[in-house]
Amino acid sequence: MTIAYNRGLTEVEAATSVSAVDTAKQTAITAMAAVKDNATLLADAKAAALAALDAAKAEYSQDDYATNWSVLEKAYNDGKTEINAAAAIEAVNSALQKATDAMAAVKNDATLLAEAKTAATDQLNSEYAKYKATDYTNANYELLTEKYNAGLSAIGGARTVDAVETALETAVAEMAAIKTNAQILADAKAAAKQAVNEAFAAYNEQDY
């Protein structure tokens, strides 16, 4: 503004004709009128930031965010609110960056599924590591390993987080259901005791 004003005075002073004076005057007035005040600059910054925020949100597809779309929309709407409420251009830029970062931080379904698979695989590996081959018959340990491998395959092939959790729970339960040598021995003892007891009960004390 000051530059336009001073230039206008200089050009008026340097004019050598009335028409040149009028031209210099009008040029200065037009130049000063074209200088944007703070309110206009702030409004322009807000409009640009809102447009940039809209463009950033348009890059995301709701189909990719079945789980977290509402979280992404909240980040977007919070950003709009902060931009509109900003009292300075710096605050506008900060609000835009904050909202853009917040949307980018929202995990899509593919990311959530990948994380669930990694976590489930790690947990299944930990469960399998608890079992020792020496505690089982060869056949039962082979069966346990089959259940473990089937679980890994089911987790890897799952298409939803719920399916991942189901695959993990199924594998863990099926491995746990396979009897150890100690359990087989205990079952045999219990069955034998029951058979002996039943045989003994068939005898009448009065007959002896």
Language-model-derived ranges and their functions:
Residues 1-9, 33-80, 107-152, 180-208:
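Amphipathic, heptad-repeat alpha-helical segments
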Residues 9-27, 33-34, 81-105, 153-178:
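Charged, amphipathic alpha-helical scaffolding segments
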